[in-house]
UniProtKB/Swiss-Prot annotation:
The keyword Signal does not apply. Residues 60-179, 209-254, 268-366, 382-446 are annotated as: Disordered. A zinc finger (RING-type) spans 456-503. It is found in: Nucleus. Residues 73-84 have a biased composition (Low complexity). This is Interferon regulatory factor 2-binding protein 2. GO terms for molecular function: transcription corepressor activity; zinc ion binding. Acts as a transcriptional repressor.
Amino acid sequence: MSSATVAASRRQSCYLCDLPRMPWAMIWDFTEPVCRGCVNYEGADRIEFVIETARHLKRAHGFQEGRSPGPSPSSSSSSSSSSSVKPQLSAKEMAQIGHTMGGPEGVTRTSQQPPPPQCLDRYSLERPPPPRLGSEYGLGRQVNGILLPNGFPKPEEPPELNRQSPNPRRTSTVPQSLGALMNGTPMGSARATIGLSGASLVAAAAATTSADLSGKRPGSVSSSEHDGKEKHRADSYSELGENHKSRAEEWISKPKTVRDTLMAMQHSHSPFDSKFKKDTGPGRVLSFEANNPVSKSGARGGRKRKTSPEPEGEGGSVKINGEGQPWLPATESLKISTMASPSFISPPSTVSPHSNRTTPPEAAQNGQSPMAALILVADNAGGNHASKDANQVHSTTRRNSSSPPSPSSMNQRRMAPRDVPSQLPSGGTSSHAGMEQGLPQSIPDSSIPNSIPLCCTLCHERLEDTHFVQCPSVPSHKFCFPCSRQSIKQQGSSGEVYCPSGEKCPLVGSNVPWAFMQGEIATILAGDVKVKKERDS
């Protein structure tokens, strides 16, 4: 016996691809022996369903169940044609068998009986596709949950499309004429175009209506529903336009500073149309009440919040008592401005950041708007830390910049309240200090470029953008290198060297005072030597 005969006798035919395989290439863990290639191609989780489908096909078309362990060399040529046809057979007939025989994947059963056994010689490589217009589909089939009329050829698809798996090719099976029917085209023209019976058209229309009534979202939104939403949205726009006119009349009685600020806020916010155009409906527009800062509309999670912090006046979400404020459109924020006192001015791009310094803060404490009071406190935060240096600040530190507020400009405002205590009533400064003690300090702004000049806390000379000493505890403590060098020499570089301001500023979150590291001291003192050499030369 030759080696080829011995090898052929040891081979086992795969149940699916019908090809002789070596024993190590076969898998016996399923109901039928299959090769590793078929298992990898179909997937181990679906191979049982494919085996069951192939078993039904073999029974229906007269294949013999019991195959010999390996084909003899003489019969290999005669069986080559059938073995080459078999993979196509199992691939193309699975969808039809899934409809007729049913399966474990949720395929719908019908009363169609399997076709009678047929001969093998009927199958060739040029076999036409099975008929799709018979009664095996029943009265209608469902696409995305909507019952559609029958009579349209379905392209050849893999068997997994019988399941409810999302597939982009699925939506392309509905003809354009049927899409016109679903979008509200008169039924007479649709019947003339498609050539369907009146019963199927009525069934399709009734199914679409029932899907809308049951709350299910149809595959394509009807034009009437879309027009209704657009009309509702247009009505809401007209109402908002009337509100704009009424508010414009109310602004006439306000002071000039308040009018300028309200106008700037109206233009700085993004328009309502672009902000809410993509919403599902105008029901997402939230209202604001003076007595209830947190809306009770139940749509707090309707719009996504931005995760990055934003300066005031830019549309960021403000928290009050630990609770996030709901998003408000530009028109609603104007309501807040009109209800608040003149001291609530969110600094826009055309107003000086300190335009609200000259007005007393008592109005914000009367309780008209908690958000107004909170933003006012945040604007004045940090003033108590620099109050001791207020009488030393040079006049060049007054801020008249027209740029919008940034974290760096907020820190610059904290450098000194300047002559504000002289302009405020007697209770103004104490109330500010009491509200500011609970606010955390912001980060140093040495790395943030801005147009406002930095000044040394001690000598009030202008600082460079990157070459100065920043106290990590008090943001308003900024010192030039000569002042820092002099302070280190006065305190003695051998021991602990604290803040050049002369105070022991505690670190954030602890009582330990901040002190220079030895490397920092060496760097500052080394700069003194270099400067002296440069001056000598």
